[in-house]
Design a protein with these regions (language model features):
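Small-residue-rich hydrophobic transmembrane alpha-helices
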Residues: 51-111, 150-169, 280-346, 379-401
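Short runs within selected transmembrane alpha-helices of multi-pass transporters and secretion channels
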Residues: 72, 76, 142-161, 169-177, ...
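Helix-capping/transition residues at the boundaries of transmembrane alpha-helices
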Residues: 43-44, 80, 161, 169, ...
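Generic alpha-helical transmembrane segments of integral inner-membrane proteins
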Residues: 26, 30, 34, 38, ...
Length: 533
């Protein structure tokens, strides 16, 4: 049967690899979401002021997560490429430098966060109960003091996932989350001889759990039993590696900032419609429901980063393309399957989150889920393609796609449709789908162009050792020969005009000359090797 379906025969093993990596990530995200829900329920028993305090504090903490993403995205891509290259020394070096960079960033965030916590919460709480600022500031200051625990947990997990181990992060995250729930209960309510610390207890419980998780991560790295083995070496900053991590990671971090700021304007537009506050409530409920629907797409995004990065680490761009294509296709299928029940059961899902069943909230929330369910296919394209490009170290297209989709599409289109054409909240929902389509189309075109291969090579050890001294025209000629066609080196003899590049290939090997410099290229089952001839 498979012989009659060559495409399926080719991609079925890749689909299995994607699911092998993605399923533990889905479970990890579910556990994290469960902990967040339980935290809200626990704090909710203290009263509405306490809920507001924690809610505002967690909004400020999103800034920390955006900064951390600037490290995790770069670390994940470089770890994947080092693992694919079968270079344990480089994988250990990437890990040590990622941890060092994280510690430096955490120190800065701790100092800044400690001083801005109360002023920022005061600004957010304009006209609200002043007790929310007092409680929220105490909670947030403690969290900022423990920034190093939070950030190292994220980076440790991302390094393992990039290197192809998504199971250990599942166990690690699951254990930390269980401890988080236990500690929060103990310190919030103070059973027995323990003091009831209320909102402050929630911060203490979180810090203790994250601290244990950080120590456990280091033990795993040094145990010698994980895919990442920390070999003897220095943790002193290597500014070249810091640059490589941030070159890949900063655009990913800025993507989060673009989404967050655009979302604030979307909320402002929603509240300006006839639905008002009820529309904002519907949007909040819709996003909460969608956060569960997003999990498979986000997990396949992580799998795509790891698989594409590993293929490029051993310089198999043809395999990287096949893996990326398979992940994108699988993401679309899975997200479409999730969209169907969102359309059918939208009213029931909204009512589940709003037991009062307020008519405007249910109506607006139902329309949100149904309109956005139609756009889940393009959302999958955007998510997974971004992950595949990240594996190649090509993260700028994701940032540009988000700018085009969010700021140049969603914000102006939502204003026009909702307020000028008076479509109300439905106009905002349509604008969100249009923005997703724009950003998804942009990154997909970038992926299909194959230019990410150039980015991957320029960030590789092959480039640093052999090609960095060449002119741009010579580099372009060399990259073209390696990229076209991707499946095999062509059998040909060629001289590229105006570059001094001579190219001869025979049965998977090639001699490439740049004036007085010559290189021998050999493609085998493990990848591409380049050496001076």
């Amino acid at each position: 049967m498979l012989r009659r379906l060559p495409v399926l025969q080719r991609y079925l093993p890749i689909y299995k690899d994607v699911w092998r990596l993605a399923l533990p990530v889905i479970l990890t995200n579910l556990l994290t979401t469960l902990v967040n829900i339980v935290d809200v329920l626990m704090v909710g028993r203290l009263g509405p002021v306490e809920i507001a305090a924690v809610g505002m504090a967690n909004t400020v903490r999103l800034v920390v997560l955006v900064v951390v993403l600037s490290v995790t995205a770069g670390s994940m891509a470089l770890a994947a490429q080092a693992k694919g290259a079968r270079d344990p020394e480089r994988l250990s070096f990437v890990t040590r430098q990622s941890l060092s960079l994280t510690v430096l960033i955490a120190a800065v965030l701790t100092l800044v966060g400690w001083f801005i916590a109360e002023p920022v919460l005061t600004f957010l709480n304009s006209g609200g109960d002043p007790r929310a600022v007092e409680l929220g500031a105490a909670y947030l200051e403690l969290l900022f003091l423990g920034t190093i625990f939070l950030t190292l947990n994220f980076v440790t997990r991302s390094l393992m996932q990039g290197a192809g181990d998504t199971v250990t992060p599942l166990y690690l995250s699951g254990s930390v989350n269980v401890l988080n729930i236990l500690f929060n209960y103990l310190f919030i309510f103070g059973p027995g001889p323990l003091p009831a610390l209320g909102v402050t207890g929630a911060a203490v419980g979180t810090l203790l759990a994250r601290g244990i998780g950080m120590v456990a991560g280091f033990i795993i790295f040094y145990s010698g039993k994980n895919v990442i083995r920390l070999l003897p070496g220095s943790y002193l900053p290597d500014w070249g590696m810091f640059r490589d991590i941030l070159t890949i990671g900063v655009p990913s971090g800025l993507q989060g900032l673009v989404r967050t700021t655009a979302q604030l304007l979307v909320i402002r537009i929603v509240t300006a419609t006839s639905a008002g506050t009820f529309g904002a409530a519907a949007l909040a409920i819709g996003l909460q429901i969608e956060s569960l629907a997003f999990m498979p797409g986000l997990a396949i995004n992580v799998a795509a980063t790891s698989l594409v990065g590993q293929s490029l680490g051993r310089w198999q761009p043809d395999e990287a393309r096949a893996r990326g294509n398979a992940a994108i296709g699988l993401g679309v299928l899975v997200m479409c399957a999730i969209g169907a029940p969102l359309i059918v059961f939208a009213p029931q899902l909204v009512t589940l989150f709003d037991p009062s069943a307020q008519a405007t909230v249910v109506s607006a929330g139902t329309s949100y889920l149904r309109v956005n369910a139609v756009g889940l296919a393009m959302l999958a394209v955007s998510m997974v393609t971004n992950g595949a490009l990240r594996g190649a170290g090509d993260t700028r297209p994701g940032l540009v796609g988000n700018l085009l989709g969010r700021w140049l599409t969603v914000v102006p289109l939502a204003y026009v449709l909702a307020l000028v054409l008076d479509l109300g909240v439905v106009g905002v929902w349509l604008a969100l789908v249009a923005g997703t389509a724009v950003s998804g189309a942009y990154v997909l075109v970038r992926w299909r162009s194959g230019r990410w291969v150039n980015v991957a090579l320029r960030g590789s050890e092959v480039y640093r050792r052999h090609l960095q001294h060449l002119t741009q025209a010579q580099q372009h000629a060399f990259l073209t020969q390696l990229r076209t066609p991707l499946m095999a080196l062509p059998e040909a003899t060629e001289h590229v005009e105006d570059t001094g590049v001579s190219y001869r290939s025979d049965e998977g090997e090639a001699d490439i000359s740049f004036g007085t410099s010559g290189y021998r290229v050999h493609r085998n089952t493990t990848g591409l090797e380049l050496s001076a001839s």
